[in-house]
Regions:
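Short acidic active-site motifs
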Residues: 21, 65-66, 147
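Short, hinge-like loop/turn segments at secondary-structure boundaries
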Residues: 30-33, 53-58, 120-127
Length: 154
């Protein structure tokens, strides 16, 4: 994913921390010619975890401000396999999308079936009328890099 982002001249907008998998992603994007925007909450600054991989950095007061900056600065939202923070970001973006405050493409990169249960849950919520939107209208699913490339090129 990172190599494709960089080589296709795209920009990665991410949390700006040097911890974890996203640091590797950011470094690889940059090594392959892409821009990297780090959106760094004060908590990351306080823990001295700010990455050097970013070409541009936005500092935010907190996680809510960070998510708002993600949405403002991004052309699309792609969720790679992740944990609680990723789920928080996914649901924040989907909630904004249902209120028509975020109109860009949302993609779950479903590597190894990571998002299968979440996809089923959203389909069930929609089928039961608990959310009015169909999943297909809220988000797309890419099961491999070719599908991700196609979705982001549309």
């Amino acid at each position: 994913v990172a190599t494709w982002i960089g080589k296709s001249g795209r920009t990665l907008v991410y949390g700006g921390s040097r911890a974890g998998l996203m640091e590797t992603l950011a470094t690889t994007v940059r090594e392959n010619g892409g821009r990297v925007i780090g959106v760094v909450p004060q908590a990351v600054v306080n823990r001295d975890l700010v990455s050097d991989a970013s070409t541009t950095v936005f500092y935010t007061a907190d996680l809510q401000d960070r998510k708002s900056t993600f949405m403002r600065e991004s052309e699309a939202f792609v969720a790679l396999p992740g944990g609680i923070g990723t789920l928080d970001e996914v649901f924040t973006v989907l909630a904004a999308k249902t209120l028509e405050k975020y109109k860009r493409r949302v993609v779950l990169y479903n590597a190894g079936g990571c998002w299968d249960e979440l996809i089923k849950m959203i389909d069930t919520l929609s089928a039961n009328g608990l959310i009015t939107e169909r999943r297909e209208d809220l988000l797309s699913v890419a099961n491999n890099i070719e599908e991700l490339e196609r979705l982001l090129s549309e």
